[in-house]
Amino acid sequence: INYYPENEYILFTNSALCNLKNDFSHELENKKLNLIYFECPVIRDVNESYVGIYSKFWLSIQLRSYALSIINADIILITSFFDGFRDNTLVSHDNTFKLPPIVSIIYDLIPLNHSDQYLNVDPEYKLFYLNKVKELSNLDALFSISESSRQEAAKYLDIDPKFIYNISSGCDERKFSLITPNSNIDSKFLGRFLLYCGATDPRKNLYRLIEAYASLPLDLIIKHKLVLTGPYTHEETILIKEWMITFGLPPEYVVFL
């Protein structure tokens, strides 16, 4: 939006969720940007057990699809297609409406590739996820965050690979800067370190990272602390510390930020 301010952008949001105006206040108040905030009406509590015709879910999809059909957009971008399990998030649409091309960002298909770990343990989520996979295959195009996710989508989804584009979500060095003097992180105390930024869910493989780090020669561990940034809940921190005990990793070499 900052690179192409001459275009018109509509932030199409869900009235059943939190108001996002404060999160985008800078962009909305910037008169150089042509950004419109729109809350699409939905029928509350869309996740009732019945989702067929005339259900709250069905009616909300009709409202959403109608709104999308009249905003005269050139393209609709969905930033996360797998949201909406047991909450009021709504990303589905009805193709009987005259809609512009619809594309979605795709991050991974890990639950599909590891169904025993993610899907088979929860039949309700499995049904939700597989329906999303089917819907995803009916979109006009996909934007993958990496070449790996592009290949994964081409392999497992029923969509022409030529409509899957790798947009790469690598970090932009212009967004980062050196630690400021008033930072509460004591870099001298850390010394040299290995940094892990992520959650504790199985797909992140933090358990194996702890195991691998603990298996390093002691002189390397002493010289390179392992720094973990979550944030983590109290329960997750306890779990990580249990892994450290399992692999005989002294707590002084692991730093939680």
Predicted regions and their residues:
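Carbohydrate transferase catalytic cores enriched for Leloir-type hexosyltransferases
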Residues: 1-257
